[in-house]
Design a protein with these regions (language model features):
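Chalcogenol-based redox active-site neighborhoods
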Residues: 2-186
Length: 186
């Protein structure tokens, strides 16, 4: 097993909370420029940030292909979509080119940035998988006020929100001024 000697470990209480602002995180964007997570890059006033594990993950390939398929439903709901991973540019580019995504994709998310997002971070099982720690999946929906409307993180690749259902739910939330849920302190 690769040991990356990560000194600071995230506590379970370091997770982002609904109703908070997404930390300001800027990463390089495929195609040039940068991508600031939580800041819409198109004519939508909401943004959904999908954090994927990386090129080594076959489930991520299926998930991003599904995101590409349902991206128009998110657009109808007024939500722009972006994806980001800790992969370097070459791996992110070959992965997304293989899938054929049209939405913005960021890369080189650092371990510190992953922690700022409250994500679970894993070490690769071998160098064949990848050469660096990577984020486990996360989905963040940021509303027009810049607040986290929806927060969904997982510690494994197998549990992720259904994208078609989420697009319909976000349309309902917007059409009905549905409040941010899960704000009561435990």
């Amino acid at each position: 097993m690769i040991n990356f000697n990560t000194k600071e470990k995230m506590n379970m209480t370091d997770k982002l909370k609904s109703g908070e602002r997404l930390p300001e995180i800027t990463v390089p964007r495929l195609g040039g420029g940068t991508l600031t997570l939580g800041t819409p890059v198109d004519d939508h006033d909401w943004q959904m940030v999908v954090v994927y594990r990386g090129k080594h993950c076959p489930i991520c390939k299926t998930y991003l292909a599904e995101l590409e398929r349902v991206a128009p439903e998110f657009a109808t709901a007024g939500v722009g979509v972006v994806a980001v991973s800790g992969d370097p540019e070459d791996r992110a580019r070959s992965f997304t080119d293989e899938i054929g995504v049209s939405f913005p994709v960021g890369y080189d998310l650092t371990v510190d940035q992953m922690r700022m997002l409250g994500l679970y971070v894993s070490e690769p099982r071998s160098e064949k998988e990848t050469d660096r720690p990577f984020a486990e999946p996360g989905v963040f929906v940021i509303n027009a006020e810049g607040l986290l409307q929806v927060v969904d993180i997982s510690n494994a690749p197998f549990a992720r929100p259904d994208l078609a259902g989420l697009a319909k739910a976000l349309k309902f939330i917007r059409d009905n001024d549905y409040p941010i849920r899960g704000r009561l302190a435990a």
